[in-house]
């Protein structure tokens, strides 16, 4: 009982932190420490919760006097626990990076409030056990993201925020419609109970289930930045400061991916493979369009932004395989991408602070004056491309292996070729930015960049440690994958085998 009650700490601590930030007022330095302390304390409880899950299996917390499926349920399995931990680590790094990057004006007002508010929504999305509360937590982190996008009030920010809000409001409307249709069919909102009841539906109801699936895919693909709903991502994510872009790129797209994986495994396993072919088709197109974008620009931010799309597609290929190997790859790669994307955005933020430009054609020769920055970026680039033994390799290895096991050889080849495109896109930044001809930047001995560079190095080191720990993590990732390719593990933990 005590162990299950600890799940709620993952939401309560960030919420208490939010309240504290409101009452602190216009004192940015205190806000920094409060936000960091709240995140660190939540991380400690997240590790405690993970340890409990590893010992006892998925843990369920039922709020109120009702049993599942009638109560509000929170469920923590290994994958959701790992996602929560990685989200908290990334958030701590982002808070530290923000000290020297977002500006005192943003820090004075609602910046840290919005960061913690968004973190609460992200964590809630990972641990909620019913579909309506998934919608609620989506709206929580979306409202926070609106605040983060407009803080600072530049013209570009406001313009891109309008587009971002319109896309997400439309997506949210379709989410409500999908939930309403699903409830009309099964009469429940509990994820595990929906899974049980959908599996018992007569075959004549398969048409309505397919329509519901299409609606959910539209909604979650929008959140994940997958094809065809990726068009908002490069513009909306380009506008705010680097710390906010790192936050969005590392966390928000992963919530959409998680929602696709969870609902596909629980709800749509019996739709004559239509759901998984659809996910695979969208995944491959996402990879292709992401690759085109990554090699089409000289802007360092846009190159990494399009690499977000490539990663989303690669992960969804693993999800579409819906076997143990594919899900292991998807989980490995999701955790890896959360860490390395944050690290790469941090690093290009340092490069911008030095050169005052994101245009590769306007700077070069940085390796002479900033060798630590250069070689740190090189390691991060290799990790992103999936070069062994760095963290990006293991996820892609399992995903490609899964495609070959299932006979989807072309899909595996697309994933492999995407690695070459990713490597080319980031090595181009490395070669031009650090070894190209210097184009006008001046070394400023008084430039305050060492703080954000230190955070960037820490992020890369954590990613490297994650890759080098792959053998130790393998049994944990294998168990995490089981709740997806064998959803009865999840449903039995919630419904007690009923």
Swiss-Prot record:
It comes from the Bacteria. One of its GO terms (biological process) is sodium ion transport. Keywords: Antiport, Cell membrane, Hydrogen ion transport, Ion transport, Membrane, Sodium, Sodium transport, Transmembrane, Transmembrane helix, Transport. The chain crosses the membrane at residues 5-25, 34-54, 75-95, 109-129, 131-151, 174-194, 207-227, 231-251, 275-295, 303-323, 331-351, 373-393, 407-427, 452-472. InterPro entries: CPA3_Na-H_Antiporter_D, NADH_UbQ_OxRdtase, ND/Mrp_TM. One of its GO terms (molecular function) is NADH dehydrogenase (ubiquinone) activity. The keyword 4Fe-4S does not apply. GO terms for cellular component: plasma membrane. Its main location: membrane. It is a multi-pass membrane protein. May form a heterooligomeric complex that consists of seven subunits: mnhA1, mnhB1, mnhC1, mnhD1, mnhE1, mnhF1 and mnhG1. Mnh complex is a Na(+)/H(+) antiporter involved in Na(+) excretion. Belongs to the CPA3 antiporters (TC 2.A.63) subunit D family. This is Na(+)/H(+) antiporter subunit D1. The gene is mnhD1.
């Amino acid at each position: 009982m005590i162990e299950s009650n600890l799940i709620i700490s993952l939401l309560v601590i960030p919420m208490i932190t939010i309240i504290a930030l409101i009452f602190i007022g216009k004192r940015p330095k205190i806000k920094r420490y409060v936000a960091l302390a709240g995140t660190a304390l939540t991380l400690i409880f997240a590790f405690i919760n993970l340890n409990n899950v590893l010992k006892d299996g998925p843990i369920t917390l039922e709020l109120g006097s009702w049993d599942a499926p009638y109560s509000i349920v929170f469920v923590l399995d290994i994958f959701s626990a790992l996602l929560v931990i990685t989200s908290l680590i990334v958030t701590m790094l982002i808070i530290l990076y923000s000290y020297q990057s977002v500006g005192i004006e943003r820090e004075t007002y609602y910046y840290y409030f919005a960061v913690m508010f968004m973190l609460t929504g992200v964590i809630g999305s990972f641990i909620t056990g019913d579909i309506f509360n998934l919608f609620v937590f989506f709206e929580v982190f979306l409202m926070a993201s609106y605040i983060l996008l407009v803080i600072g009030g530049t013209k570009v920010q406001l313009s891109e925020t309008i587009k971002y809000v319109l896309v997400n409001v439309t997506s949210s409307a379709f989410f409500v419609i999908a939930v309403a249709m699903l409830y009309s069919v099964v009469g429940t909102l509990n994820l595990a109970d929906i899974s049980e009841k959908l599996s018992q539906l007569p075959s004549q109801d398969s048409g309505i289930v397919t329509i519901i699936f299409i609606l959910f895919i539209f909604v979650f693909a929008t959140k994940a930045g997958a094809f065809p709903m990726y068009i908002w991502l490069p513009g909306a994510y380009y506008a705010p400061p680097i710390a906010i872009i790192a936050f969005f790129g590392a966390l928000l797209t992963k919530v959409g991916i998680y929602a696709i994986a969870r609902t596909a495994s629980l709800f749509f396993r019996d739709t004559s493979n239509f759901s998984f072919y659809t996910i695979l088709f969208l995944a491959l197109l996402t990879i292709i369009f992401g690759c085109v974008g990554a090699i089409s620009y000289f802007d360092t931010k846009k190159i990494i932004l399009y690499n977000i799309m490539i990663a989303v597609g690669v992960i969804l290929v693993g999800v579409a395989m819906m076997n143990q190997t594919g899900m292991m790859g998807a989980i490995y790669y999701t955790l890896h991408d959360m860490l390395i994307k944050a690290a790469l955005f941090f690093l290009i933020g340092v490069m911008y602070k030095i050169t005052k430009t994101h245009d590769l054609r306007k700077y070069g020769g940085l390796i002479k004056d900033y060798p630590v920055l250069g070689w740190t970026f090189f390691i991060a680039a290799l990790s992103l491309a999936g070069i062994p033994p760095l963290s990006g390799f293991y996820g892609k290895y399992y995903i490609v292996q899964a495609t070959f096991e299932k006979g989807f050889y072309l899909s595996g080849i697309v994933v492999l070729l995407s690695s070459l495109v990713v490597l080319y896109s980031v090595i181009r930044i490395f070669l031009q930015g650090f070894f190209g001809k210097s184009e006008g930047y001046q070394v400023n001995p008084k430039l305050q960049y060492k703080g954000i560079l230190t955070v960037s190095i820490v992020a890369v080191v954590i990613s490297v440690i994650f890759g080098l720990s792959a053998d130790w993590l393998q049994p944990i990732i294998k168990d995490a994958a089981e709740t997806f390719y064998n959803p009865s593990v999840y449903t039995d933990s919630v419904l007690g085998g009923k």
